[in-house]
């Protein structure tokens, strides 16, 4: 009924509008005013958003990956830490598994010029990945990630001196991000910064390192800086207008630390000294605070006590004291020199179940860091820690049916490969592997190749071996080195074609790890998925921009009727 009235009100035939009697016009205006009020109130509070997120996951080591030296990079940075190019199918899998939110960490400085402008191609790629998340109906937290950290090239540090030096660059960055997404709805949140450290790169709290005495003056300066960054972030985002005037924003504590005692009260200062930014434009209720935690799980009694203390502390020192909801933006286990999931598997499952249930009890959203699906598993996509993913979801939602946790056992892919150039290459493995862990590689083709048609090529040694059968094995030798960065299937001539059925890395104990092929250079690859999550043809179904009734984009809409994503709404 309201849409019908909107159409009549938007009709541009002046003669028709003159004939409308005053009483009818008044009725329409009253309906529109009511609709406007409903629209203005529909942008949920941060507390509502955090509760509605359920359980989340981090798309880690992907858009946040960088060359660790501060130099400029192109779009290939997304895969430089060994993760594959992100596909929309991955987000579809996470949604179907029961996850309600994805944190998208992004490192920006390798993609900014000297005038602080973000490369257009990089912004477009970030935009695409954000859309993958939102198009699956999940919440998305977009942040500034390894621009913070403990390396010299990390330019955001928690000192007022650094803040004063980089304030212009920091605000320019957030102004561009905010402008890019200003028309997006309430399921997109911005996170101001990741784990920001002082000039001494101290984790947990300023002046933490034991080789230096605690310096209260230096610590206060760090907390003052954190609060200044947080306020700049809120002010810049709000000033861009559009939906950013009400968007829920996230600020982190110093180092995203979650407090604790440790024999002194200093860790808790990360919570108590955080000042929630003034948010005049949005009013109260649109800011959340984020912390990270990675407990040890060697002793489950101690672990559960630590978890209990954590959530009690977050409630008393943040939610109750400052009136803000809390997001656990990263959580996992300490992995004391090894992978807990492998060596303390039962403890990890028990911990995840307990942690998520406790977080739900305290109305905290949780975002598991990495794991669950990692490396080439993301491309298929499948879970390599399916039982952990299922534990996390069931801890929050209960034994609700309908969620899916595909593994490599559930998926079969074949790759049709056409070599367009002589000596062109297909990636069988990309990303560093150690010959102390793996002893070889197994390749299975649909049929045996012609003699001398193909060969294995190993990098960086560039050692080669002919592929002579439908199933061929490459045994790693000392001549190939202790570390292998890439293995390809090279064609001796242009025009060769083949179908790859399976590629496995063979571990020292004989177990196999399936991998995914991709084009290296001079060849084209078509993937045929026999089972599993079906491919998604990505088209941006919504552009989230706001238009007037004449179809013109409006960047700063005032009062009136507008169109967004094909629907009319009234902005009061």
Please name every model-derived segment.
Residues 36-40:
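Sec/Tat signal peptide C-region and signal peptidase I cleavage site
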Residues 1, 7, 529-572:
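C-terminal outer-membrane/trafficking sorting elements
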Residues 43-44, 50-261:
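Active-site mouth of glycoside hydrolases
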Residues 56, 347-408:
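Extended, alpha-helix-rich binding/interface surfaces that flank or overlap catalytic cores
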Residues 411-485, 490-513:
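Extracellular ligand-binding interfaces
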């Amino acid at each position: 009924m309201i849409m019908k009235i909107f159409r009549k009100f938007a009709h541009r035939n002046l003669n028709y509008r003159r004939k409308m009697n005053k009483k009818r016009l008044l009725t329409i205006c009253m309906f529109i005013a009511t609709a406007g009020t409903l629209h203005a109130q529909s942008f949920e509070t941060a507390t509502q958003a955090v509760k509605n997120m359920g359980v989340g996951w981090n798309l880690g080591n992907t858009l946040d990956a960088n060359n660790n030296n501060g130099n400029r990079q192109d779009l290939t940075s997304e895969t430089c830490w060994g993760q594959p190019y992100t596909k929309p199918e991955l987000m579809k899998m996470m949604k179907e598994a029961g996850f309600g939110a994805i944190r998208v960490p992004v490192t920006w400085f390798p993609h900014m010029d000297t005038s602080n402008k973000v490369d257009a191609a990089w912004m477009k790629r970030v935009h695409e990945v954000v859309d993958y998340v939102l198009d699956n109906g999940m919440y998305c937290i977009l942040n500034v990630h390894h621009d913070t950290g403990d390396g010299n090239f990390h330019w955001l540090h928690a000192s007022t001196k650094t803040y004063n030096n980089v304030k212009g660059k920091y605000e320019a960055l957030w102004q561009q991000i905010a402008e890019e997404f200003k028309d997006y709805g309430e399921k997109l949140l911005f996170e101001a910064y990741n784990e920001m450290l002082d000039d001494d790169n101290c984790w947990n709290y300023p002046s933490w390192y034991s080789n230096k005495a605690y310096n209260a003056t230096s610590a206060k300066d760090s907390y003052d800086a954190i609060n200044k960054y947080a306020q700049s972030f809120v002010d810049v985002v709000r000033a861009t207008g559009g939906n950013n005037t009400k968007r829920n924003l996230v600020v982190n504590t110093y180092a995203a630390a979650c407090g604790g005692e440790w024999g002194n009260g200093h860790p808790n200062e990360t919570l108590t000294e955080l000042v929630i930014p003034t948010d005049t434009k949005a009013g109260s209720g649109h800011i959340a605070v984020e912390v990270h935690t990675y407990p040890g799980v060697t002793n489950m009694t101690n672990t559960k006590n630590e978890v209990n203390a954590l959530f009690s502390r977050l409630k008393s020192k943040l939610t109750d004291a400052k009136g803000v909801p809390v997001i656990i933006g990263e959580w996992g286990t300490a992995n004391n020199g090894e992978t807990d999931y492998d060596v303390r598997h039962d403890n990890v499952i028990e911990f995840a179940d307990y942690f998520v249930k406790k977080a739900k009890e305290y109305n905290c959203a949780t975002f598991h860091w990495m794991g669950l699906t990692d490396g080439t598993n993301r491309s298929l996509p499948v879970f390599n820690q399916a039982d952990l993913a299922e534990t996390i979801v069931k801890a929050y939602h209960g034994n609700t049916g309908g969620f899916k946790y595909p593994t490599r056992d559930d998926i079969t892919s074949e790759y049709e490969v056409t070599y367009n150039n002589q000596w062109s290459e297909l990636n069988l493995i990309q990303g560093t592997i150690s010959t102390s862990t793996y002893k070889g590689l197994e390749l299975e083709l649909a049929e045996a190749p012609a003699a001398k048609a193909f060969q294995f090529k190993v990098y960086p040694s560039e050692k080669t071996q002919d592929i002579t059968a439908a199933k061929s094995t490459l045994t790693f030798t000392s001549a190939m080195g202790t570390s292998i960065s890439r293995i390809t299937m090279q064609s001796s001539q242009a025009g060769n074609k083949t179908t790859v059925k399976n590629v496995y890395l063979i571990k020292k104990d004989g177990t196999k790890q399936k991998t995914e092929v991709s084009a290296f250079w001079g060849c084209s690859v078509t993937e045929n998925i026999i089972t599993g999550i079906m491919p998604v043809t990505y088209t941006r179904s919504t552009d989230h921009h706001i238009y007037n009734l004449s179809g013109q984009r409006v960047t700063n809409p005032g009062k009136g009727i507008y169109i967004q994503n094909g629907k009319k709404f009234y902005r009061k």
